[in-house]
Amino acid sequence: MVKLLLLILLSGSSLFLNAQDFIPFWPEGKMPNTKGMKLKDSIANERIYQVGTPGMYAYFPSKQENKGAAVLICPGGGYERLAYVISGIQLAKWLNSIGISAFVLNYRLPNSPDLIEREKGPLQDAQRAIRYIHTHANEWGIKQDKIGIQGSSAGGHLASQAGSINADFSAIGDSLDKVSFVPDFMILVSPVIDMGIYAHKGSRKNLLGENLADKLIKQYSTQLQVNAKTPPAFIIHASNDQSVNPQNSILFYQALLEKKVSASLHIFPQGGHALAIRNNPGSANAWTNLCEEWMIEMGFIPESLSK
């Protein structure tokens, strides 16, 4: 296993040992916001530091267990790297275990030398991925109105952007332009939301750069972008998170309530900035069960197949 992992790290080709398929979603020569540079994937310590080809890794449940829903997973990493195992693969496998198709997003990072507008790259990739899932939903056994998005930490910021920003940044003049780029629901784990007083400074710097104009701060503080069309959200955070202030989740939840968007917020006493699928302390360990029950309650997965 060590030798195999070393070969993967050296080659920079296949990122995920257990991924079913890698799906590049931008046609050759059509990717927006690019200088045309040819980049290679850069990986170290289960983190991706440079994305060569944006795309997504598909994980499907068995046909017998498939419940017809899908979730696009946005790994965290402070917009500097992608923590593709703990906030990617592990989540995908959990979703598969409850009958949900999962897609781990390999999105361009703002520090990519190929990006023209650094702050737009991640959202462009997320919007395109959602459109691509919609386009292939029938062949994958996915219902068109049950395509959600999940994000942890900075990935939660990207997921909240996808749900709250109505502007289309991913149109390239092909048939997918006519397809929805907005998710049907959001699952946010310890999300970065605010770019102002409660900002995670590393994520803000990596996304927006050093010179912070008020316009950019407001535009990328996603609690300020919530609107009546924003999809329902399930949000979790830990009170003792020393990296991303739980006020981020509270602000987003309050914004959803103000716009009369259905939302569920759970703030656990312990967990720090390490809420994940495994090894959560105390009551935080129940979050996956709560999330599954929420998806049943909201009608995104059927109750009859979950028992």
Annotate the PLM regions:
Residues 20-65:
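N-terminal cap/lid segment of alpha/beta-hydrolase-fold proteins
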Residues 43, 191-225, 231:
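Mobile cap/lid helix-loop segments that gate and shape the active-site cleft of serine hydrolases
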Residues 83-84, 90, 107-144, 281-285:
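Catalytic nucleophile-loop/oxyanion-hole region of alpha/beta-hydrolase
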Residues 250-307:
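C-terminal catalytic histidine-bearing segment of alpha/beta-hydrolase fold enzymes
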Residues 235-237, 241:
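Short beta-strand/loop motif that positions the catalytic acidic residue
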Residues 128-201, 217-218:
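Primarily recognizes the serine-hydrolase "nucleophile elbow" in alpha/beta-hydrolase
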Residues 67-76:
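Short beta-strand element of the alpha/beta-hydrolase
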Residues 84-104:
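Short amphipathic alpha-helix adjacent to the substrate-entry channel of hydrolases
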